Amino acid sequence: MGFIKIINILKYFIIFNISVITIYCISFSARAEIMERTLKNGLQVILKKDTRAPVVTSHIWYKIGSADEVSGKTGLSHALEHMMFKGTKKNPGGIFSQTISKLGGKENAFTSKDYTAYYQTLPSQYLEEALKFESDRMSNLVVKKEDFLKEIEVIKEERRLRTDDQSEGIAYEQLYANAYANSSYHDPIIGWMEDLDHMTEKDISDWYDNWYAPNNATAVIVGDIDFDKTIKLVEKYYGAKKPVKITERVKRNEPYQFGEKNVSIKIKGKPSYIIMGYKVPSLNNKNIESWECYALSVLSGILSSGQNSRLQKILVREKKIASYADSGYSMFSRNDPLFLIDVNPIIGKKISIIENELEKIITELKTKLVTRKELERIKAQVLASEVYQRDSIDYQARVLGMIKTSVGDTKIIDQYTANIAAVTAEQVREVAKKYLVSNLQTVVKVNEKIQ
């Protein structure tokens, strides 16, 4: 269980020596292998057949995440994720997990800004067991005060370990809090400690009652399945679930940013660190052409995909001023995300030196076209990564669930290969010039004065 740190989870760039031509001919998914249905109660169902092994993964995705929370009530989605493992009247705490384990399977859950998801991966003959348990807790969760009081302390400790005691965690949190003045992406997924201190079991119960329903969920099942038998099982266990009235989500638009935002943090005993984010569009942004999102993905690859990427080559290998340098971008988000760049300086190297080199790298991307060789190499790596990770049924389910929940149309997956392949050097330069600019930028530096 846990919340998702976007810059790590959304890094799909893995290097492979695969012919670009070969990769371009591979579609991420074939429509013949996918069935999509919507039950009468509003539950969306996606089935994907993969018979290479007698295994299945069953996911349920709820369109509810930290972006739906309000000031003073942050962390509810993540806290509810924890409480979902405490059991129902029919299946008290622990029975679900114990059963899945005995059947040779595994289970877990994750929360993001846009969604909360639960999954089980197990031998395909036991799919019905997973559906039986998962459907039960969609509407029958028991939230006990004693369970909540114990679990909220676990969550607070998780926050201390992952955020409050980590340079990167604090910087990442402050980046979003400062970059977004009004957007619902302002608050951390795990919640502010002040809000966790005041959270109650009633807050959890109300959140559950308001959002956990078939008409706010997508069931994704991938693996060694028969479509007809599987859809009947889904109907059997979810078909009788009653929909609820879902509160209309009001998009909170960002006001114009007049210049670069800079945040400097001092943390005693911690190493220096810098992270910057630029406000960029997602595929849900109707004010831009979709090619910009694919060009931004390629741009991220140019910066950090492999040992020959700009950040690795210049900061880590040539200048030897950083031990780690990365970038990240996801076009698959409900609201406009951040294009991220983060660097761990070598001990003794000033952050100002890192900033100067980053400025040179970004300026070059704005003023010069990337070479055809570099562009094709990056495209090959991005696409090869997608093809490689398609071997995992869990990865396939995650992509389907994420896109269905955040964007709405899974056909985007089929178009991904062609859209990445179509990106030009001119388009990469154009998005760099348009988005990697000061009035879209927020920079957070940890211990910048340390030498």
Language-model-detected regions and their locations in the chain:
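Non-catalytic beta-strand/loop surface segments
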Residues: C25-S66, N91-Y126, R162-N216, A240-K286, ...
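Bacterial N-terminal signal peptides
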Residues: Y12-C25
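Active-site SXXK
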Residues: T74-T88
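N-terminal secretory signal peptides that target proteins for export/translocation
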Residues: M1-L10
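Short, polar/flexible loop-turn hinges at active-site or ligand-entry regions and domain interfaces
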Residues: K86-K90, M138-E146, V370-T371
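Short amphipathic alpha-helices in soluble, non-transmembrane regions
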Residues: K132-D136, L233-Y237, I354-E359
